[in-house]
Amino acid sequence: MSRRNKRSRRRRKKPLNTIQPGPSKPSAQDEPIKSVSHHSSKIGTNPMLAFILGGNEDLSDDSDWDEDFSLENTLMPLNEVSLKGKHDSKHFNKGFDNNTALHEVNTKWEAFYSSVKIRQRDVKVYFATDDILIKVREADDIDRKGPWEQAAVDRLRFQRRIADTEKILSAVLLRKKLNPMEHE
């Protein structure tokens, strides 16, 4: 069976579940619920959330979804919001009076911060005085170096020693090579 025939026989995927409004309070059941969409299309924005919520139930592992990929078919419409038609302030602000409570908090805040004295400083940076500073013992070079650094220092020292002794010994060894009978 050719790939083209397989594609043409494949059923068209159903659009995913739409978000339904959650259960409302018993006192608000008589109010109509409106569904407001930001965009007119039903394109969702989060495929992982759609999978978790069960929006991709009709997808199987063997389907080639990339061949007929369509955002409208694979994603949930996550850009819809449900709103109540009327606002019932009795249930919304249960026991909280906006004007008086907010006014009380603001007056307490202003009273507290008006009593706090803030000292303005001309200089932005301050350094500690000498008696507060901690004295640090200087470490020896050997204490700070690891074994690889000590090996490198030894190698340089031996190279210097060889170069210094070569100057002295080369003259003596050169004379021995020139007159081997003389020194025996």
UniProtKB/Swiss-Prot annotation:
Q: Name one GO biological process term.
A: regulation of primary metabolic process
The UniProt keyword set, sorted, is: Host-virus interaction, Inhibition of host innate immune response by virus, Inhibition of host interferon signaling pathway by virus, Interferon antiviral system evasion, Late protein, Modulation of host PP1 activity by virus, Viral immunoevasion
Which spans are transmembrane here?
none
Is DNA-binding set as a keyword in this record? no
Tell me any Pfam family this protein matches. PP1c_bdg
> Compositionally biased, Basic residues: which spans?
1-15
Q: Which InterPro entries does the entry mention?
A: PPP1R15 (IPR051254), Prot_Pase1_reg-su15A/B_C (IPR019523)
Superkingdom classification of source: Viruses
Segments for region (Disordered) = 1-41
Q: Which residue intervals make up region (Important for host CHOP inhibition)?
A: 125-127, 169-173
Question: What is its induction behaviour?
Answer: Expressed in the late phase of the viral replicative cycle.
Renumbered to this chain, the signal peptide range is none
For whether the record's keyword set contains Metal-binding, the answer is no
GO terms for MF: protein serine/threonine phosphatase inhibitor activity
| Entry function | Interacts with the host phosphatase PP1 catalytic subunit (PPP1CB) and recruits it to dephosphorylate EIF2S1/eIF2alpha and therefore restores the host translation that has been shut-down by the host. Also inhibits the EIF2S1/eIF2alpha-ATF4-DDIT3/CHOP pathway.
Q: How does it assemble?
A: Interacts (via C-terminus) with host PPP1CB.
Q: Which family does it belong to?
A: Belongs to the asfivirus DP71L family.
Which protein are we looking at? Protein DP71L
Which species is this record about? Answer: African swine fever virus (isolate Tick/Malawi/Lil 20-1/1983)
